[in-house]
Amino acid sequence: MKKTLIILTVLLLSVLTAACSSSSGNQNSKEHKVAVTHDLGKTNVPEHPKRVVVLELGFIDTLLDLGITPVGVADDNKAKQLINKDVLKKIDGYTSVGTRSQPSMEKIASLKPDLIIADTTRHKKVYDQLKKIAPTIALNNLNADYQDTIDASLTIAKAVGKEKEMEKKLTAHEEKLSETKQKISANSQSVLLIGNTNDTIMARDENFFTSRLLTQVGYRYAISTSGNSDSSNGGDSVNMKMTLEQLLKTDPDVIILMTGKTDDLDADGKRPIEKNVLWKKLKAVKNGHVYHVDRAVWSLRRSVDGANAILDELQKEMPAAKK
């Protein structure tokens, strides 16, 4: 009888212990969430997510800075053209989830992510679909200015539980920004960023990420938003169409030409616009203040690392701006 009682007591204790353990586990599961406020609301993100999918290129750098390699990236199926080669090496092995404008829900779901980072402008209409797959935060990158990018970096850091690491990164960035401002003498010179020039001149407006960065180091941006922004490509309102006559009227002190594989080039490697009589009348052309830069860095890499890369180029590649 005693033996039976002992056995029953042991079994009862085992059941109670298991029940307590299960209850504790469920409680911990609920507790181990981080409430993240973003552009489309508030999302509870699992603490320290490891399987992260990004739907805009600028978010890649931020994750890498925080020690996380994304498992999925919306790369428009042309990663070599759009992603910096050094960054591409670091994320080797990721899965493409299609285009940034129309990411594949099936591919995203197949990766079983525990966090999706979407772009506010591009993915607002599919946000409800995304959050059914995994916790999703939406941040501004496509139309982000400089401060938007800093804010998004801090939000991502909170979502993955690495705020201290990002604060350290931003402190170093601020030091580089100050150093660049001291090394170059912009003296409020007007500057203009130009992308494609095949059919019409596509300039970035004052609200663009790189435009705002340039004003941080002392330049004055040559144009302001005037209602003629291009809203194609998922709401890309930071683009402004200009004619050569309008450009000549603006006549910036410095022109930065962002190059890429979509640009029409002559046999000698020049854009047809560079041989136009009106182009040659521009102040920046006459004074040798036209600079050719990589579009993947100056336009697509909207991140703290992207900003640092631009600051490095400003210090090294623009001698006319040096003291």
From Swiss-Prot:
Q: Pfam families attached here?
A: Peripla_BP_2 (PF01497)
SUPFAM superfamilies in the record, alphabetically?
Helical backbone' metal receptor
Q: What induces it?
A: Transcriptionally regulated by fur; repressed by iron.
The UniProt entry lists membrane topology as: Lipid-anchor
Keywords of the record, alphabetical order, are:
Cell membrane, Lipoprotein, Membrane, Palmitate, Signal, Transport
Q: Which CDD domains match?
A: FhuD (cd01146)
Superkingdom per UniProt: Bacteria
One GO biological process this protein is involved in is:
iron coordination entity transport
> Where is it mostly found?
membrane
Question: According to the Swiss-Prot or TrEMBL entry, at which residues is a lipid covalently attached (N-palmitoyl cysteine)?
Answer: C20
The record's PROSITE patterns line, in alphabetical order, gives: FE_B12_PBP, PROKAR_LIPOPROTEIN
- Where does the record place the Fe/B12 periplasmic-binding domain? 51-322
Lipidated residues (S-diacylglycerol cysteine): C20
GO-annotated cellular components: membrane raft; outer membrane-bounded periplasmic space; plasma membrane
Query: Where does the record locate the signal sequence feature?
Result: 1-19
Where is this protein found?
Cell membrane; Membrane raft
Q: How does it assemble?
A: Interacts with FloT.
Name the protein family.
Belongs to the bacterial solute-binding protein 8 family.
Query: What name does the UniProt record give this protein?
Result: Putative ABC transporter substrate-binding lipoprotein YhfQ
Gene label: yhfQ
